[in-house]
Amino acid sequence: MGKFIKQLSKFGKKVGGALTSNTAKKIYKTIGDTAVRFAESDIGSAAIDGLIQGSVESVLTGESYGETVKRAVLLNVLGAGDEIPDPLSPGEQGIQRKIKELEDEMKGEVVRTKHNEQIIRRFGADLDEVYKFAVSEYKEGVEEKDQFEILKKALTSYGELTKAEFGELKRLEKALQKESSERSKDESMMVKEYRQKIEALKDAIEVESTGIQEEAIQEIAGMSADILESAAEEVPLFGGGVATSIATARAIEGGYKLKKVINALSGIDLSHLRTPKIQPKTLEAILEAPTKEEIKDLSLVEGIQMKLQNLEENRNEVLHIQEEILPKLREAMIEDHKEIGDERDKRILPKTAMRFKVPTTQQPVIQIYSAPWDSDDVFMFHCISHHHLNESSFLGFDLELEYVHYEDLTRHWHALGAAQEVTGRSLKEAYSEFFQLAAQIDGAGAIHQKRLIRSKSYHPIYLGAMHYDIAYRELKNNALKIVNDSEVQKHLLRGPKHFQRRAILSALKDGVKLLGGVDLAEFMRYA
């Protein structure tokens, strides 16, 4: 279990300290009267933000300009990744979720129609049987399908898809780790094709990164979503060229409605089994590579290893459902049919499915809460892992006080969980302590302090949930980076409050990368 409680860092703190501290006279002598007058003037005070703030701050405090202001880039791509809504806006979240579902359904249908024969040949006729069950019309007198068998086939097919994707990616990882002279013909071709995609991404990102403003946290945009997804897909199972025709495991699952059938029959929601279209670690490698230079193989391997970790979590989750939950569901089916005296035991009764429903607040997503009072400033994320891992963590922010609280939480007990007993601290204990400690911080206004103490006695307001595409361990690492890296905090905590909240959520879901600072002499030449 880990716990971190910290003050957040913002730009401007060192400037204020330098102008009012006991060392001011020494600094004034060093930098001269002109710079001091500028910093203390109304115009200077207003302008000490972003790039100008970084310049003045570095002069006043003697810091390296490059260490003062860097360019911050969120490691997702607009159009290709999920665009991040304001976490405190359930309406924005709902619209984005619905649009995403419709897009995925459309792409899945295109893949199923175009590659159906190849897919069935490789993964078996069970896929087709599950799809026909999902779309078939009920007819009187036609023999009813054994729903438990359909459920087993859907889970087995999904397991085969994740296994195939994992295997192909593992092949690419091994090929990249070899010297080019040691690669087989197939491995060389695989690496060459992958590198061509990476170069396409790199070219697009370089065009965009030249326009990234030093004073703002940015997202990468520029290529259309289809082209980006096509470029980012390491090893498509079939097809290629345009994203809508790439048969990835994600697209095949959607096309044959595997998750929908599993959820409809058993109540088991597997919507959290996802992989990012573009791996954040791969974007980081591209951003770190010098312009016009080739990205090192080992840097690309890191991105692939993160995706393998993500796929491993998904595979283990499907295995957990198959090995631990399905036998229990079969027993529950028999019990429930006996109870109502129904001999048609091919059906999974709604009562049986409801036994395996997981409460909304314990599903493997980022659960979002706000304080009952001062909700715009005080909000929390409850990050929950896959069912088989059974871990969770708490991340709370008070933007008014510039305060953050992180804590690893208890293992949940529920129908799909792996925990045999509940251990550790609960969400209630974590948010109560968060409110209590925030209220004790120096500088808290009397009204804000009262509201924090009052909030401690009430449950936070539940505002919805966001899926995350990366592995839970990577999500935790992102949270700890936000908590412990003062440079990252300075870039996240800028702009309007809704922009700050959105940046924090994106940094948690996708990660954030700080690029190098801008040369001070170059800036002053054009200032």
From Swiss-Prot:
GO terms for molecular function: structural molecule activity. GO terms for cellular component: viral outer capsid. Signal peptide: none annotated. Pfam families: Orbi_VP5 (PF00901). Residues 1-42 are annotated as: Involved in membrane permeabilization. Its main location: virion. VP5 protein is one of the two proteins (with VP2) which constitute the virus particle outer capsid. Acts as a membrane permeabilization protein that mediates release of viral particles from endosomal compartments into the cytoplasm. Permeabilization activity is probably negatively regulated by VP2 and is triggered by endosomal degradation of VP2 and exposure to low pH. Keywords: Capsid protein, Outer capsid protein, Viral penetration into host cytoplasm, Viral penetration via permeabilization of host membrane, Virion, Virus entry into host cell. The keyword Transport does not apply. This is Outer capsid protein VP5. One of its GO terms (biological process) is symbiont entry into host cell via permeabilization of host membrane. It is found in: Virion. Belongs to the orbivirus VP5 family.
